Amino acid sequence: MGQKIHPTGFRLAVSRNWASRWYANNNNFAAMLQEDIGVREYLKKKLKNASVGRVVIERPAKNARITIFSSRPGVVIGKKGEDIELLKSELQKRMGVPVHVNIEEIRKPETDAQLIADSITQQLERRIMFRRAMKRAMQNAMRLGAQGIKIMSAGRLNGIEIARTEWYREGRVPLHTLRADIDYATSEAKTTYGIIGVKVWVYKGDTLGRNDAPVVEEVAEEKRPRRNARPGDRRPRRDGEGAPAGARRGAPRRGGAGDGKTGE
């Protein structure tokens, strides 16, 4: 039975980049990874109303640089930058190193997979019909430039006794094409009947080497000389050009002694 690979992990180093960008040896790797997970969970709770799409963490030279992608950057920054300063000081206490916080605005939140999934889960928690929430999100995404979208919900939908899975798709979502820019995200709705999981795939068109792809330096190929070739060697052309006079195809032969012809 075929299963779906994670679209982001499948495209790492091709058209996607890592969300945590740092290097650690074997002794520190687990602790730093656990620290990143804790920072993301803290930011998710702290900025619940700021529509945060994703968080990128970098660690250059005993520092930390955190980039927060949000569709409402004003909520993150706060009045006169007060909220972001409090956030920065809290993150420095957690990580133990100087932290720089950058805010990036998401221009089209209707086509961001994480924001779509979070929006659907919030509607499910407010007891809105799951079909209505899913179809409305699909219509908004297609209207604002997405080439395809697929949404799947699983759990006790509408409070039924037996859990089931339902999904809807509009446009095309080529999961096996590496150059396809697939934005994938998941979210969970905590309802009175239990947890309902939501998965979202958004196809934004083909891409290779742009957007969030890692930069790879291209090495110029050197033309190697032909094996056992000497300078000045040249193969004769097939049409006979460059051959000595009389050797070209179709050239008239000259008469001479012993050719059986006598001049008249």
UniProtKB/Swiss-Prot annotation:
One biological process term in Gene Ontology: translation
Gene3D superfamilies: 3.30.300.20, Ribosomal protein S3, C-terminal domain
Ranges of compositional bias, category Gly residues: 253-264
Keyword field: Ribonucleoprotein, Ribosomal protein, RNA-binding, rRNA-binding
SUPFAM superfamilies named among the record's database cross-references: Prokaryotic type KH domain (KH-domain type II), Ribosomal protein S3 C-terminal domain
Entry's Gene Ontology cellular component terms: cytosolic small ribosomal subunit
Keyword Transmembrane helix in record: no
HAMAP family: Ribosomal_uS3_B (MF_01309_B)
Family membership: Belongs to the universal ribosomal protein uS3 family.
Subunit structure: Part of the 30S ribosomal subunit. Forms a tight complex with proteins S10 and S14.
Protein name in the entry: Small ribosomal subunit protein uS3
Phylogenetic placement of the source organism: Bacteria, Pseudomonadati, Pseudomonadota, Betaproteobacteria, Burkholderiales
